[in-house]
Every structure is written in C-alpha cells, then in structure tokens.
Curated annotation (Swiss-Prot):
The gene is queF. It is found in: Cytoplasm. The active site is at residues 187, 194. NADPH binds at residues 88-89, 255-256. One of its GO terms (cellular component) is cytoplasm. This is NADPH-dependent 7-cyano-7-deazaguanine reductase. Substrate binds at residues 86-88, 226-227. Signal peptide: none annotated. It comes from Haemophilus influenzae (strain PittGG). It catalyses: 7-aminomethyl-7-carbaguanine + 2 NADP(+) = 7-cyano-7-deazaguanine + 2 NADPH + 3 H(+). Pathway: tRNA modification; tRNA-queuosine biosynthesis.
Length: 279
C-alpha cells in the first residue's frame, strides 16, 4: 500500500491554511478509495454490498438575502461505491467558506453542498440540512449489543495485528451484536488520535470475545482514515471468522465540527444517523 501517493501529498491536512471568506467549492479535496482498497485486494469487488460514510456537520452557517446569519446541522451520506472519500479538513474549510456568503434559503445551501460533494466524491451523496430545532429534540442513543470491553485481560502490545483473529471462532452458530468503545486509531496524515465506538452485527460461527477485543485494541497506534479502518475490520472478520452475514459500523467522536461514521454491511440497510454519548 503506497501512502506516498500524490493524492495524499497535496492534502491540506496537517498544513497551515487560511480560511476562505466566501463560498469556494474548490476547497474540497478527494482521497481515492483505491489507496486503501488496493492493499486489501477489494478495489474491484468489495465484500460489502451496502455502505456509506455518514457525516454529521455541526458548524454550518451562511447569510440570508438580507445578510442575517443562518445556522444548520447536516446529515451527509457518502456512498461506499464513490470513487473518492472526502478529506475531512478540506470539508471543514469548504463548509467555513459559506459563512459570509448569501443564499436564498436552506434548500439552496443543501443543493449546493450536494452538487459539490457529488463532484468531489465521484459518486452518490445525499445531504440533509436540518434546523437546530431538529437536533434539540434528538436523544443521546446507544448502539444495541453486548459490550466486550469489561474483560479481565492483560494487554501488552498496541501494534496493529490481524492475527489476533486467528482461530477466533467456535462451531456454535449464533447471531450477535457486539459493541466496543475502545476503538482508537490515528489520522493517516497528522497522527492525531481518532476515538470511536465499534458495532459488529454478524450471523455465523461464534467469535471469541477476547480475541476480538485484542484485535480492536491493536488499532491503538495504527494510522488510517476512519473509513479505511472500518473496511479493514470488515475484511479481517470475513477472512478469519467467515460469517454468513456481517455489518461493521463505527461512530467516531467529533473533530472540527464534524463526526464521521462509516457503515459497511452485506445484509443490512443503512441506519438513520444518530448521536452517541461521546458525540
């Protein structure tokens, strides 16, 4: 996997940047999904058939035609089959460029964002712009399943190691939903920590919870984007556990007014966006 690709070298992430005072769609920067999928051997055929990068954008503002500031929160679904993912700092800079620009109404802003994101991602993107009142009524949710974090085990290594999943299943066939709040990886470019809650829903041979937890913890010093981590977890579970059905879903904490929540499945529909306690 060659992370020195020119598409990474040109990213604004980790560089000192200035904030645009007027709307500028050219601030958006794509990252080819193939950069990570080539290494996983899934560029042409992905083992998941349903998926999206689900973003929540909390810091959106623009001016109405009379110059009065408006604010909103956006739910954004970026299809897993898009050619590119969107680099998060460039997305933040792009959203900030709306701050001093005039738009006629919510719909004009929503349509503008959707058009620009589709062009950058080279794939399907859905944008829903919400008034703040919608989120005032939103409850803090939790992901349903058995939490695997309270095991009395000793951890001595924090280097990524997929081999923790070797021989991880028994002969018992089950349907399980498992949750871990201990997912932590690091940004591919800046090395900043990314904190997430991981949800795994599968049907197949029962996965050993200790081996799974050790595997999750091994991401602690691993450098990849959120979306790439989730696809790696999906591929590793398919390789070692070989479930009949599998969903991998991670909800990461907010940074720069954005949270990113990748969802990949071979049997479940996309979830409604929600908000966890750490979000």
């Amino acid at each position: 996997m060659n992370y020195q690709d020119n598409s990474l070298k040109s990213l604004k992430l980790g560089q000192k940047t200035e904030y645009a005072s007027q709307y500028d769609r050219t601030l958006l920067q794509p990252v080819p999904r193939a950069l990570n999928r080539d290494g996983l051997g899934i560029t042409q055929n992905q083992p998941f058939t349903i998926g999206a990068d689900i973003w929540t954008a909390y810091e959106i503002s623009w001016l109405n035609e009379k110059g009065l500031p408006q604010v909103a929160i956006a739910d954004i679904y970026l299809d897993y089959q898009s050619q590119n993912l969107i680099e998060s700092k460039s997305f933040k800079l792009y959203l900030n460029s709306f701050n001093q620009s005039k738009f006629t109404d919510f719909n004009a802003v929503q349509q503008t964002m959707q058009r620009d994101l589709i062009e950058c991602a080279q794939g399907d993107v859905k944008v829903r712009l919400n008034p703040v009142a919608v989120y005032d009524a939103q409850k803090i949710e939790h992901l349903q399943g058995d939490c695997i974090d309270e095991q009395d085990i000793e951890i001595t290594s924090y280097e990524f190691n997929a081999n923790w999943l070797k021989d991880c299943v028994s002969d018992e066939i089950v349907e399980e939903k498992l949750v871990s709040h201990l997912l932590k990886s690091n940004c591919l470019i800046t090395n900043q920590p990314d904190w997430g809650t991981l949800h795994i829903h599968y049907v197949g041979k029962k996965i050993n919870h200790e081996k799974l937890l050790r595997y999750v913890v091994s991401f602690r010093q691993h450098n990849e984007f959120h979306e790439q981590c989730v696809e790696r977890i999906f591929c590793d579970l398919m390789h070692y556990a070989k479930p009949e059905k599998l969903t991998v879903y991670a909800r990461y904490t907010r940074r720069g007014g954005l949270d990113i929540n990748p969802f990949r499945s071979n049997f479940e529909n996309l979830p409604e966006n929600l908000r966890l306690a750490r979000q």
